[in-house]
Regions:
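Acidic, Ser/Thr-rich low-complexity segments on the non-lumenal side of membrane proteins
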Residues: 43-74
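Alpha-helical repeat scaffolds
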Residues: 41-50, 75-87, 111-127, 146-152
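Generic helix N-cap/helix-start motif at coil->alpha-helix transitions
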Residues: 19-29, 54-63, 91-100, 126-137
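Residue-level signature for tetratricopeptide repeat
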Residues: 29, 33, 64-71, 101-108, ...
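A membrane-cytosol interface segment of integral membrane proteins
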Residues: 98-118
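Feature marks short, highly hydrophobic, charge-poor N-terminal signal-anchor/signal peptide-like helices
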Residues: 1-9
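Transmembrane-cytosolic junction motif
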Residues: 15-42
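Soluble C-terminal extramembrane regulatory/interaction domains of multi-pass membrane proteins
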Residues: 130-152
Length: 152
């Protein structure tokens, strides 16, 4: 009798683990399908659904939302997403990824002030080579400095 209970518990555990992974992958596939088809309403609705909130942490959902707004080219929502994500708790790898993504976005938008703020934040978390590269890009494109011509 004890073996039957143990076997049943093991089977139930395996089914739950496999089932949740399948469900999570199913949600991700639906998100990708909506994004590829340009169905942003369905994409954002699925991001806000209870299963998505259960399986994906807030940072991941907001990062996916940001990518949706970038594909949609909704500048106001992109800025709101960057503000929200940059204020969230995240590990250094996530923070560096978001800071660099925001830096290049605001570089395209010619926003000196925001790029400068992001460069300062980047200096606290990134390798010197990354910050130096971004500093050079900032100086050339936004400050219009020509002092790097000899180095190139």
């Amino acid at each position: 009798m004890d073996y039957k209970i143990i076997i049943l518990a093991v089977v139930i555990t395996i089914v739950l683990i496999v089932g949740t992974q399948v469900w999570k992958q199913s949600i991700l596939k639906k998100l990708l399908k909506h994004m590829q088809q340009g169905d942003f309403n369905a994409y954002f609705k699925l991001l806000d659904s209870l299963p998505c909130k259960y399986f994906y942490p807030p940072f991941n959902r907001e990062y996916m939302r940001l990518n949706g707004y970038i594909m949609k080219a909704d500048k106001k929502k992109i800025e709101e997403c960057f503000e929200l994500i940059l204020s969230m708790r995240m590990n250094k790898k996530q923070e560096l990824d978001v800071v660099i993504k925001a830096f290049y976005y605001y570089l395209d938008e010619d926003s000196k002030k925001k790029c400068k703020t992001l460069l300062e934040r980047m200096k606290k978390i990134a390798d010197e080579s990354i910050t130096q590269e971004c500093q050079v890009i900032y100086d050339i494109l936004l400050e219009e400095k020509t002092s790097y011509i000899d180095d190139m």
